[in-house]
């Protein structure tokens, strides 16, 4: 796995600032987290690449994550931002740090980052955030404290999952799909039917969604080829909906609208993930489906009641 190490000694950190507004009472820890974020954002704004990445304040995994992201897109930060701090199972988190992904289309360039920290305040992960409105809807629709923590975990999982496509991180994607995962991908096909009037030799144009079934290894092999063909990949998730299985409380269904942008291809469709949290430290995707939302003319061809959900799959244990 290639890894870039970056230096920020030539970047002027005073051009921008970052602060944590609330959510943490330990002032020394708060200050450390703020300094670590500012150092990282300075690196984003530096065009220089060297062997002198952040020497402290960041984990090795986070270095790899950021390096892979920067290999595929240029990230620029130019704001003064204040974010709340959220306590998580594994440490702390700040959300909504605004950046521009300069390789993306203009309309999609403006994004926000989610930054995770260890209990000691070191940066442990960076991912591209889901929309603030979507996050609030997900976290407000909870039934218990356990459900809140699980939803928090699911949001982090979904954001890391999305960012893995932007990073072209095949090892991560290989690790989150179950070896027995079911992959279903839809595509729009055109066909013609003859008029019911026997006296008329008229054929009418129709469209339907045709589905292709793959296993994990077939899907990842195809994805690897897509990554190689495209200089950049930018995946955006919208309208995220999370549903807990009525019988198995460690199974969740996640439905979302996915917008895919890359060097040579773009599309829009609905993604469904059935995620198994029976091992909470290593959640696995058991089912992944993708259905096109519109045809080439921009007409909607997928109706709401045709979108895959938990009820479409039978779980055997």
Feature annotation, model-predicted:
Residues 1-15:
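Bacterial Sec-dependent N-terminal signal peptides
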Residues 11-48, 122-163, 167, 175:
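Short, low-complexity N-terminal intrinsically disordered segments enriched in polar/charged residues
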Residues 14-15, 22, 58-116, 197-267:
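Surface-exposed, charged secondary-structure patches
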Residues 17-20, 33, 37, 51, ...:
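Generic preference for hydrophobic/aromatic residues in regular secondary structure cores
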Residues 25-33, 82-97, 181, 186-188:
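Short, charged N-terminal helix-start/capping segments
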Residues 31-70, 168-196:
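Short, well-ordered alpha-helical segments enriched in acidic and aromatic residues
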Residues 104-150, 247-255, 261-317:
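Short beta-strand edge/turn micro-motifs at domain boundaries
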Residues 131-212, 216-240, 244-249:
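Acidic, serine/threonine- and glycine-rich low-complexity intrinsically disordered segments
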């Amino acid at each position: 796995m290639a890894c870039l190490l970056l230096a920020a000694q030539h970047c002027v950190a005073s051009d921008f600032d970052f602060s944590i507004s609330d959510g943490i009472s330990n002032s020394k820890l708060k200050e450390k987290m703020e300094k670590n974020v500012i150092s990282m954002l300075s690196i984003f704004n530096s065009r220089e690449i060297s062997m002198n990445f952040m020497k402290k304040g960041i984990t090795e995994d986070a270095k790899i994550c950021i390096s892979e992201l920067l290999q595929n897109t240029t990230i620029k930060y130019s704001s003064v931002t204040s974010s709340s701090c959220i306590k998580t199972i594994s440490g702390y988190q700040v959300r909504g740090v605004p950046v521009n992904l300069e390789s993306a289309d203009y309309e999609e360039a403006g994004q926000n980052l989610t930054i995770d920290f260890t209990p000691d305040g070191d940066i442990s992960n960076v991912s591209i955030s889901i929309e603030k409105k979507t996050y609030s809807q997900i976290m407000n629709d909870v039934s218990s404290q356990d459900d809140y923590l699980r939803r928090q975990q699911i949001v982090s999982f979904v954001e890391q999952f999305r960012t893995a496509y932007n990073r072209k991180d095949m090892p991560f994607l290989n690790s989150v799909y179950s070896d027995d995962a079911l992959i279903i991908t839809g595509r729009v096909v055109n066909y013609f039917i003859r008029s019911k009037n026997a006296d008329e030799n008229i054929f009418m144009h129709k469209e339907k969604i045709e589905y292709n079934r793959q296993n994990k290894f077939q899907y990842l092999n195809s994805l690897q080829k897509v990554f190689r063909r495209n200089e950049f990949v930018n995946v955006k998730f919208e309208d995220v909906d999370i549903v807990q299985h009525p019988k198995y409380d460690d199974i969740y269904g996640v439905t979302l609208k996915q917008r895919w942008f890359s060097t040579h291809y773009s599309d829009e469709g609905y993604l469904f993930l059935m995620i198994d949290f029976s091992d909470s430290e290593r959640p696995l995707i058991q089912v992944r489906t993708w259905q096109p939302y519109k045809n080439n003319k921009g007409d909607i061809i997928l109706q709401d009641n045709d979108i895959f959900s938990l009820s479409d799959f039978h779980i055997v244990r």
